[in-house]
């Protein structure tokens, strides 16, 4: 199976890996677009003011332009270690065992706006680019969705395994899921005291990170939707078909534990 994660706006600095080399990344069919986007981002960064405007950076984020300017020579680290934030804190890549890293390497991909789909262990540099960022201030310049969607969709269409999409909708549009059985977008819902379910906003990313971690620990070797749902039920997770005619799955968060300022979504009641 392949678990698809969104990236994060925040990223760790540094790294011990050698600079970006496209031939070391998964999904080689994406190399032409990767090369095009990286070149455009680096070129944009040569004009500081234009980059600040195009990337919608605030005064305290101006240093992100230098990050982008340095992409060709910057050190790299594994993708799951590069990204930070709520989802990645919950996934906690730093505590994965060697065996779990092997599972993640073959079963997890991150949807980067800069590099497209990358494997969990692919070496990536620090950068600043979002799915809705502009690569040029020129009128009519191609959006990232326009640049990535065809190649990204083809990369997923070539696969015949189970696809579990935990990306936000903006990033999912950069590589749309194929329209087939076994390709599922996951929506996170919360169950309130009355038993009703509703969209979960604040803890959405956290719940996705916890699910991704559980899948990695479980081996992420499910060959069908039924196998996945059976595993989830056995582990005490409520993962179910949306029942609305789509192929979406719903992940129900039964409760949030902790105290204000230190709350945590729980996937088990």
PLM-predicted stretches and their roles:
Residues 53-126:
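A glycine-rich, hydrophobic loop/mini-helix early in the fold
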Residues 6-7, 19, 28-32, 59, ...:
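Proline-rich intrinsically disordered, low-complexity coils
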Residues 1-62:
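N-terminal "assembly arms/tails" that initiate or stabilize quaternary assembly
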Residues 93-269:
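Internal, well-folded beta-alpha domain core
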Residues 16, 67-70, 90, 190, ...:
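Generic signal for short, ordered secondary-structure residues
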């Amino acid at each position: 199976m392949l678990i698809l994660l969104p990236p994060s706006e925040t990223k760790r600095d540094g790294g011990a890996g050698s600079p970006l080399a496209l031939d070391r990344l998964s999904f080689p069919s994406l190399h032409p677009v990767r090369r095009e986007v990286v070149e455009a981002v680096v070129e944009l960064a040569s004009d500081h003011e234009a980059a600040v405007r195009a990337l919608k950076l605030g005064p305290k984020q101006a240093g992100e332009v230098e990050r982008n300017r340095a992409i060709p020579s910057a050190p790299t680290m594994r993708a799951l270690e590069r990204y930070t934030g709520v989802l990645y804190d919950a996934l906690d890549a730093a505590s994965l065992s060697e065996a779990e890293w092997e599972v993640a390497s073959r079963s997890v991909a991150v949807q980067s706006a800069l590099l497209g789909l990358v494997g969990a262990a692919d070496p990536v540099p620090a950068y600043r680019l979002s799915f809705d960022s502009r690569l040029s201030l020129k009128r009519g310049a191609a959006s990232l969705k326009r640049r990535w969607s065809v190649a990204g969709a083809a990369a997923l269409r070539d696969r015949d395994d189970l696809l579990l999409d935990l990306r936000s909708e903006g990033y999912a549009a950069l590589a749309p899921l194929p329209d087939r059985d076994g390709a599922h977008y996951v929506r996170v819902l919360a169950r309130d005291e009355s038993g009703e379910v509703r969209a979960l906003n604040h803890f959405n990313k956290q719940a996705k990170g916890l699910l991704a971690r559980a899948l990695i620990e479980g081996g992420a070797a499910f060959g069908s939707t039924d196998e996945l749902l059976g595993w989830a039920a056995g582990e005490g997770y409520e993962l179910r078909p949306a029942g609305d005619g789509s192929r979406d799955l719903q992940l129900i968060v039964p409760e949030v534990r902790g105290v204000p300022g230190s709350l945590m979504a729980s996937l088990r009641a």
